[in-house]
Amino acid sequence: SELLRIKLLDKSDVQNQTKEKPAYKKYFSHGTSHHLGLDTHDYCDLDMPFEKNMVLTVEPGIYIKDEDFGIRLEDDVVINSSGDPTNLMKNIPIQIEEIEAIMNNG
């Protein structure tokens, strides 16, 4: 719905999408997550249940080729002993105003 709101997609894009080629893939060319460990991209069985101390990324992004623009925000989360995720990046600023303030006061 956000891509519709900012007019990167229109209703016909959504109506004509297929399961194999969803409309959002025009602007999102990678996966949403991967395991993180000794290697930057650790690979595990995707059907494996989460376990304590597993670390995964959460990587929403958008890439607008016509404007040579792209951005991806990454959070890294660890599965804690209760099985819930803990965001390891929670204190890192990601809001526009926070980043601009840091840049202006650099």
Describe these PLM feature segments:
Residues 1-33:
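Active-site cores enriched in adjacent His and Asp/Glu residues with nearby glycine-rich loops
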Residues 32-106:
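Charged, cofactor-coupling segments
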